[in-house]
Each structure stands twice: as C-alpha cells, then as structure tokens.
Amino acid sequence: MKKTNKPKKQGKSGKPKKNKSLAKRNKHELIKAIFSVLQEHPEEGFNYKQIAAKLHITDAPRRDMLVKQLVQLKEKKRIVEIDRGKYQAIPMQHYYVGTLDVSSRGNGYVIVDGLDNDIFVAQNFLNKALHGDLVEVYVFPRFRNRNKMEGEISKVLERNKVRFVGTVQMHKNFAFVVPTDARMYTDFFVLKDKLNGAQDGDRVIVRIEDWKDKSDSPMGVVEQILGKPGEQTTEMHSILAEYGLPYTYPEEVEAFAKKLDLSITDEEIARRRDMRETLTFTIDPRDAKDFDDALSFKVLENGNYEIGVHIADVSHYVKEGTILDEEAYNRATSVYLVDRVVPMLPEILCNFACSLRPDEDKYTFSAVFEMNKKAEVVDIWIGRTVTHSSFRFAYEEAQSVIEQAKVGEGYTIPAETSITDKERAVPAEVVEAILTLNTLAEKLRGKRMRLGAITFDKVEVKFDLDENGNPTGVYFKESKEANKLIEEFMLLANRKVAEYVAKMKKTFVYCVHDEPDADKLQQFNTVINRFGYSLDLKNRQTTTDSINNLLEEVKGKKEQNLVDTLAIRSMAKATYTTKNIGHYGLAFDYYTHFTSPIRRYPDVMVHRLLQLYLDNAPSQPEAEYETKCKHSSQMESLAASAERDSIKYMQVKYMEAHKNQQFAGVISGVTEWGIYVEITVNKCEGLVRARDIKDDYYTFDEQQYALVGQATGKMYQLGDEVMIRVKNTDLMKKQLDFELVD
C-alpha cells in the first residue's frame, strides 16, 4: 500500500496543534540553561537580554518564553530580583527537603532530617502540598538564623498518596468531596460524570486527577463507594482506606489459597522432627482465632527441661512468587481494629490451616531449648517440626492456673473464667508445665531487667460491644503473669534465632531499636519533675533503671497513662532492617521477629531465610531484603495508626451518650490552640479550646509548655487535674470537645 503524508492535526484556530511533551521538554531545558548562566556567576545579576545573549536566543518567541520563565522562577522563590529586571540564583542552602506534617488547623511543619526544629509553613504558603508529601521548602531570609524557621513550599517532590476518603456534597452539575481527615485543608471538585454512582451524603474514596495552578481545589474522580456515614462498617472501612489499607481479600487470592494442599502427609512428616507426643498447648486472648504459637514442655532425665517454642509454618504454604505471597507482602501485617481483624492471609490459612488449633496435627517451625532450673539455655535446636496441641487456654484461664493451682495436682478452671462457660479440668502434668514455665519466665524477665531492659506495661483501652458493634462500656486490659509467660518465651525464641543466624554473617531480617535521643529524654524528665519524679540520665544503666522505677511507681495513679505515653514517645521506634544495631528497649544485642508469621510478613521472611541457611544456602541479596524491611516497617506504622483511629472512633461514639456530663481528667497535651484532657475513668481524650477558657486571655508558653493567662498568670500544664464537661462529639473527625468546669 502506498504511504500518504497525513495532514497535521489542526487546532480550533486552524493552526497546527502544539506538541505538549515537546513544549514541556523545551521549558525544562530552558530552566536548566537559565540556572547554568546564573550559577556560573552567582555574585552578579543578569537581565533577560544578557541571559538571552549568553544562551544565543535571538528570536522573539523564545525571548518571550525566557521572560515568562524568569517571572515564574521568581514567584517560586528559585531566583531573586536584586535590581529592576536583574536576577540572581538563590543559593540552594536556603532550601530544604523534608516531609510535610499538616495540623488539623491547616498549617504545616516540614520535618527535615538533621534539623533540630521543624520548619513552620503557614497554610497560604503550602502551595498545594498535602500532609505526608515529600517537599522542597524555601526558608524566608528573616528566619534563617533563628531556632524557629518559617518558609514556603517551593516544590512537591513526591505525593504521599493520591486517594482520600470523604463525603459527597452534591450540587447541580458537580459535587465536592469533603475529606474526613482534618489535616486536609481542601475539598475535591468532582464532575457529575466522575461520581461513578455516588449520591449525596455517600462516604467515598476519591482520587486526585489534576490540580491546576489557578484552581483552589483538586479535580477528583470517585473510585469507590464505602457506604453511608455513621454505619459501623462504613466507618471502619473509611479508617482503613484513609491509610491505604485493604479491607477485603481479592477473589483470585482466596481461590488460590483454597486450591492449596492443606493436608498433613507422611512424606512431609518424614522431613520434619516429629514432636506430636510431647505435651503442647497454646495461651492466647479469649477471642483469638489465629494461634501463631504454642509451647511444649518435657522434664528430661538429667532434671533439665525441654521447652519448645513452636510457630505456625506459614512459609510451607505461602511460597515466594505466588499471588498469595504478593498479597501477603503488600499487606505486610494484619490490622486489629476495635471490632474486627483484617488479616494478612486468607481466612482458610490464618484461622484454619496455619492456626495451631487444639487436637489437630500442624506443621510448625520450632526453637527447642534445653533449659536448667536457673532459666539458662544449655542447648538449642532450630528446625521444622510437626506438633499437636492438646490444650487451648485463654490468658484468663492460664492466669487462674498460676494463681490457684498446685504442682502435683489437677485443677478445675471455674466456669466464670472458662472459655467454654463451663468448668474445665486441667490435668496435673499440664498444671506442672504452666507453673514451671511461669517460674522460668520470671527468671528470664529478671535477667533482662538487670541487663537494662525497659518494661512498658501501658494500659490498653478495650470496649464492651453489643451485637451491632456499638460500645456499651470501657475497660482496661492488664498484662498479668500468663501474658508475661508467653512474652518471655517468644522473646527468647526471637533472640536466639537472631543470634543463631548472626554467627553465620549472612543477610537476615532484624528488628532493631535505637538508643533514645538525649534531648527527648531530657524533655521527658522535665515534664515528670512536675509530678515529683526524676530520671538519672548519667548512663544507659541508670537511665533504664530509673525509667523502670518510674513506670512501676506511677502504676495505678492518675498520671499513669500520661507518663506511660510520654515515656514511649521519648523512645526511638523499632524498625525492620538487615543492618543490626541491637534492641535498646529489650537490652538484646540481636533480635528478630520469628514468632508471628500469620500476622507479620517479616516473620515469614525470617522463616524462609532461616530454612535456606539451615540447608547451607549462600547469603541472600541484602538490598532486596532491606527494601522489604522498609516496606514492612511502613505498613506496620500505618496499621498502628488505623488501630488508634478505630479506638478514637469508638471513644467518641461511647461519649455520645455522655454529652453535657462532667468528668475529672488530667491535662495530657498543651498546644497554642488549647489543652487536651484525658478523662480519668475511661481514658477518652478531648480538646478544651483556648478561646473557650473565658476567665482570661491565654497564650502558649513554649518554655513552660503551658497555657498562661495574660492578666492573671494562671497556668494550665501537663498533668494538671481539671474538671471538664463534654461539649461536643464529632464522629466524622473522631474528636471530642470539652469545656472546663469551675
């Protein structure tokens, strides 16, 4: 066929249509050229004619483009006009790159690695940057040599996310989606044909499509309808979607999991250590379904104990390269909201095939210890096993055994404690196992504390829920001996597995916890001084000892939750990495996560690496595993945020029935816009706005971390006891508003 020259596309004016990508490329080339001229002679100023001459620009269209770019670069604070029409490049040291943290009031703070203080950015200088974005910020000259820097966002380098949760507000031919996140300072403009079936009032997921320079709001498209606000499922799905977390399982992954061979075969048993005859049991929360771990116990002829820590062998079923593994990696963790669990694995695996349910043979990965009566590890064996759990205990049941039973005798768990709501008989050999393990756990814990471990027994807020998932009461979960028994043996297994691989000097996944920042510890010390406490910060040992003494001393006191929270905030965050630095909080030189592969992907990686190295495989690619570690750390952080939001939501919902009621509370936070108060009896936290404190005009004193009345000098500080009235509850924002009561 003969080729013909196609006519060029014509615009409405009849002129050839511009090649947008070419124009964009030409623009970027011109900007680079402008900077090359200005940076070559940084002390001089150049007007557009001089720059044009240096760049050999002679035609009028390109000169016009040059003038336009100079004006835009000046507006973006990339160059400065030192004299009329004369420009200089702004030195790059006046720019910083960091992560934008937007407050609920709409202002932002850019967090820059290496800077002691964040850079404040007023809302009108955010320039379309959103919470969590990686940004470039220009610092205003008058603030450069001060502790408090202020600036303007000059460039969004990377969006944190493009999908947001909000509520549809319909207009005639368009709609706005109002975000649920108070840190989002703009609505989304959505054309009618981009609503995809969403109606007025629907809660939806909206994706940013475009945000034009002169538009106040970004253009969006509705991707998913979550439901009607106020419905429990809608609200929980909204929380998950806000953090980019899934709430359903892809059908193709579920189908893949259902086709797996889940049987226990003789061939596979032959490849494993068979421990089905050894006494084995699980201790878990009352409502648990995913039993990751079990303990086995046997008295040896030499008087020592054989103690097995047996972990669900998830990697036997979840193979690398499958869609099942890909989905598990993407999720990286199970998410535990107040009223539901969003599992990392399909239900057929997490609650059935992998779960170490009683009276079923299971494939496990085990660390088996020989331990003497001093809780010293004499010998260790690590490898794949097959086990059989004979008993399943709730923590309350095991605690009942610890408190009431005697060695050498059987024990009956009372009906009111039993998970069956009936009396349960516990054989004498199981009683002996639990009591002996508890004694050994206490010794293990004592050793850790002497080495400088820190014990955080922060109070966990739990809710009584009715059949519709609505909160009817609040209670606090305590960590007792049964919890600590399991904790100590899981810590032991995690530590010993990490030490075992570390000796090989091969790539591995570690859970590390850096030393706390000295300034944060000093700030924490300053706050607790107001309660009459103090820390000895001379060295690591005195620091950890005094923190432990403090945490023990505040137990049961009104300030306990505040002190516990501030202590945790003063610490670094634990993360996953291939580069081991030890675990400060646990006082371990080596530590990993081996014990929860049903709900944590790093544990799956640990199992795989461990088996490879047991089979004498070479070290695996470090860069690949470091990337997976970072992803896992990020996903666990997002999951923790979602879990906190679900608690806040339930607290607000619970307090709806208590509007206008008065409660005693403790000031848990102080800001320039008000004080946060935590109600003592239920740990619900709300805001008393500074403008609502009518007896004076209050301003924030940063040095004393207090709101101070300008006329009276009256102060509101962290830890002060106050009486409040519940003024308002906002379920959408998950916020409580309080007012002070005289």
Protein language model features and the residues they cover:
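Charge-lined substrate channels and their catalytic hotspots, especially those that engage the 3′ end
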Residues: 2-308, 315-364, 392, 400, ...
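A short macromolecule-binding patch
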Residues: 117-122, 184-190, 683-700
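Electropositive polyanion-binding surfaces
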Residues: 53, 205, 211-212, 238, ...
